[in-house]
Amino acid sequence: MLSPQKTRFRKQHRGRMKGISYRGNNICFGKYGLKALEPAWITPRQIEAGRRAITRKFRRGGKIWVRVFPDKPVTVRSSETRMGSGKGSHKYFVAVVKPGLILYEIGGVTENIAKRAILIAASKMPMQTQFIISG
């Protein structure tokens, strides 16, 4: 699973996912991509599930670029805990996704195969996405 080797701080504020993505919203490496249309948090398991779905569809050939990385720590309080007594313990990392961000890029395959692979990966994502072609 994806997670940062080191973090500067162990815990972070939740923050708000307002606005659109101004960075990482263009296709840079491949020819086809999967673009987010809604804000969401994506877990490493969801990223890996999407990547595996794409590679399975390729069989041989083609290249995948994963453009998101989970770097935000999420804390969880144990159930039936009273209010107060500090922030919960670290549970997992998430990638913060804003509308317009490219999640995956694909190259070296035909448009038909790329579209099928991307649509399968899109079904694993927790938000609305769109298949896009560079050009």
UniProtKB/Swiss-Prot annotation:
Please list the GO biological process terms of this entry.
mitochondrial translation
Record's CDD domains?
Ribosomal_L16_L10e (cd01433)
**Pfam families assigned to the protein according to its UniProt record, in alphabetical order:** Ribosomal_L16
Subcellular localization is given as: Plastid
Q: InterPro entries under this entry? A: Ribosomal_uL16 (IPR047873), Ribosomal_uL16_bact-type (IPR000114), Ribosomal_uL16_CS (IPR020798), Ribosomal_uL16_dom (IPR016180), Ribosomal_uL16_sf (IPR036920)
Tell me the Gene3D superfamilies matching this sequence.
Ribosomal protein L10e/L16
Looking up PROSITE patterns in the UniProt record yields: RIBOSOMAL_L16_1, RIBOSOMAL_L16_2
The record lists the membrane-crossing segments as none
Q: May I have one GO cellular component term?
A: plastid
Q: Which domain of life does this protein belong to?
A: Eukaryota
Q: Name one GO molecular function term.
A: rRNA binding
Keyword list, A-Z: Plastid, Ribonucleoprotein, Ribosomal protein
NCBIfam families from the UniProt entry: rplP_bact
| Family statement | Belongs to the universal ribosomal protein uL16 family.
Q: How does it assemble?
A: Part of the 50S ribosomal subunit.
Q: What is this protein called?
A: Large ribosomal subunit protein uL16c
Source organism (scientific name): Epifagus virginiana
Q: What is this organism's lineage?
A: Eukaryota, Viridiplantae, Streptophyta, Embryophyta, Tracheophyta
Q: Which gene encodes it?
A: rpl16
